[in-house]
Amino acid sequence: MKKITVIDSHTGGEPTRLVIDGFPDLGRGSMAERLQILEREHDQWRRACVLEPRGSDVLVGALLCQPQAGDACAGVIFFNNSGYLGMCGHGTIGLVRSLYHLGRIDQGVHRIETPVGTVEATLHEDLSVSVRNVPAYRYRTQVMLQLPGHGKVHGDIAWGGNWFFLISDHGQRIALDNVEALTHYTRDVRQALEAAGITGAEGGVIDHIELFADDPQADSRNFVLCPGKAYDRSPCGTGTSAKLACLAADGKLAPGQAWRQASVIGSQFSAHYEKVGEQLIPILRGSAHISAEATLLLDDSDPFVWGIGS
């Protein structure tokens, strides 16, 4: 019987499962190198952790790793039901809150190594978390897609830790009771991008689709389709970072100016950015809540020990 020890949390409604023990040893390389080892040699552990029957399509996993640098409090590898994520904003907030719950960190600034770089996270007195993300930028603007049944659609391609296609003029109603239609629409967008060979820089796969609309309680409301066909319940940290990059490129948001991003379920992140040389550094703030302490049991006699669909 194999065992995986986890802490579950949610950030603005979006769950994170932090793996604190039980995965195979991945060595002492960088987080990017360890991700490659996990994906190439031990991917069944990801599947066991986040696929049904122990997980679900919406669940994001976060493997807690020993960092390389002495000034970092943790390393982390993010994954979901379809594969791996370079960075995850809501997951980083959940990670920090979980480490505090475990008594491993206190309030203050903490450095966290990810596969796409080191981020800084601040645990505040009210236990909200600010994340100083990796640099974000807009790669292309007003990219035209021919979408079957919807005609021409224009969007921006931006990096916020993952690749996003961001659409403001889409004609969709962003509301929780319209999630099924929004999911179909954004899947069509992703398929159209793939069919047209449209990518991020250096062929990066655009696996997140983000729609925006007005919101009476925030600067914007979004709907984000994540890899694996699930939608983000939170406002999406890397997606908000990509949005900041687009707003800055259009001259619509100044450094330090606050932006409040709402999700399709109404949860919110506050955000702003700083310029460091030519780089745009997003800073996001949100809250996570602990929902479970658990031990996942992997019984070799279980036909779905490594997940349904594995």
Swiss-Prot record:
Active site: C88 (proton acceptor), C236 (proton donor)
E.C. number: 5.1.1.8
Pfam families: Pro_racemase
Top-level taxon in the UniProt lineage: Bacteria
Residues binding substrate: G89, H90, H208, D232, G237, T238
Keywords tagged on the record: Isomerase
InterPro entries: Pro_racemase_fam
Catalytic activity: trans-4-hydroxy-L-proline = cis-4-hydroxy-D-proline
Isomerase keyword on record: yes
A GO term, aspect molecular function: 4-hydroxyproline epimerase activity
PANTHER family, per the entry: TRANS-3-HYDROXY-L-PROLINE DEHYDRATASE (PTHR33442:SF1)
Protein family per UniProt: Belongs to the proline racemase family.
General function of this protein: Catalyzes the epimerization of trans-4-hydroxy-L-proline (t4LHyp) to cis-4-hydroxy-D-proline (c4DHyp). Is likely involved in a degradation pathway that converts t4LHyp to alpha-ketoglutarate. Displays no proline racemase activity.
Name this protein carries in UniProt: 4-hydroxyproline 2-epimerase
Organism encoding this protein: Pseudomonas fluorescens (strain ATCC BAA-477 / NRRL B-23932 / Pf-5)
